[in-house]
């Protein structure tokens, strides 16, 4: 390490051949004769020559150590860049050509996404199917509030005999297959209300006797009115 640092320190000394060592009279404090001065000057020149030679050797060693890998790295980089130019372009072109084909194939292979069916939708579908099946067995006329209807009902407890009920429809509650109607009539001066499921299999026939126009959807106010308003022919 010291051998490498010493030439760097010696490089600071100027390289002029005519330069002589500075007088040592002031430094040493006593006079020096010419022979000794000449010997000192020769010694200084020899030191200068040694320092110059050592600096040249050091510079040559330094350049040989540090410049050779730099040249090799530069050559390697240039070769890598030259060799990778053409394949990079070809790879890019191939990738651009293959991307649309893959996207089209994926679009064709993917099946259409099915929408999620909620529980309420399922119940609605089942109600529609049940209503459609019940209407095929027995057609149901359009019944509105205020109509006078006649219903033929089969009673299982009465040896399946048919009973006829007639009255005014005071309300209708729509609930799919569970739709019901409420009928009111006067029996022995007393108002009687009966609820019938509209799609019940025990109902064999529903007949609309007459239609009446009313303003309200539910005629519950007839309960407080006179019985003659709830009678019909």
From Swiss-Prot:
Annotated transit peptide: 1-77
Pfam families: Ribosomal_L19 (PF01245)
Biological processes annotated in GO: translation
Keyword Glycoprotein included in the entry's annotation: no
GO MF term set: rRNA binding; structural constituent of ribosome
Keywords from the named record: Chloroplast, Plastid, Ribonucleoprotein, Ribosomal protein, RNA-binding, rRNA-binding, Transit peptide
Gene Ontology CC annotations of this record: chloroplast; ribonucleoprotein complex; ribosome
Subcellular locations according to the entry: Plastid, Chloroplast
Self-association and partners: Component of the chloroplast large ribosomal subunit (LSU). Mature 70S chloroplast ribosomes of higher plants consist of a small (30S) and a large (50S) subunit. The 30S small subunit contains 1 molecule of ribosomal RNA (16S rRNA) and 24 different proteins. The 50S large subunit contains 3 rRNA molecules (23S, 5S and 4.5S rRNA) and 33 different proteins.
Protein family membership: Belongs to the bacterial ribosomal protein bL19 family.
Biological role: Component of the chloroplast ribosome (chloro-ribosome), a dedicated translation machinery responsible for the synthesis of chloroplast genome-encoded proteins, including proteins of the transcription and translation machinery and components of the photosynthetic apparatus.
Protein name: Large ribosomal subunit protein bL19c
Organism: Spinacia oleracea
Gene: RPL19
């Amino acid at each position: 390490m010291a051998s490498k640092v010493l030439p760097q320190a010696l490089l600071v000394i100027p390289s002029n051949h005519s330069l002589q060592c500075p007088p040592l009279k002031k430094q040493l404090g006593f006079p020096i004769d010419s022979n000794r001065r000449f010997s000192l000057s020769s010694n200084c020149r020899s030191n200068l020559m040694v320092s110059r030679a050592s600096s040249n050797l050091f510079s040559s060693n330094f350049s040989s150590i540090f410049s050779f890998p730099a040249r090799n790295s530069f050559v390697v980089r240039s070769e890598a860049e030259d060799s990778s130019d053409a394949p990079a372009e070809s790879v890019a072109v191939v990738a651009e050509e293959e991307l649309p084909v893959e996207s089209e194939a994926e679009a064709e292979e993917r099946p259409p996404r099915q929408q999620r069916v909620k529980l309420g939708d399922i119940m609605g579908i089942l109600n529609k199917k049940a209503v459609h099946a019940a209407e095929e067995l027995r057609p149901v006329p359009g019944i509105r509030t205020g109509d006078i209807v006649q219903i033929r009902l089969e009673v299982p407890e009465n040896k399946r005999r048919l009973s006829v009920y007639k009255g005014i429809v005071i309300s209708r509650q729509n609930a799919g297959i569970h739709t019901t109607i409420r009928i009111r009539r006067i029996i022995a001066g007393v108002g009687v209300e009966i609820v019938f499921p509209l799609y019940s299999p025990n109902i064999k026939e529903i007949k609309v006797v007459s239609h009446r126009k009313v303003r309200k959807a539910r005629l519950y106010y007839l309960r407080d009115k006179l019985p003659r308003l709830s009678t019909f022919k």
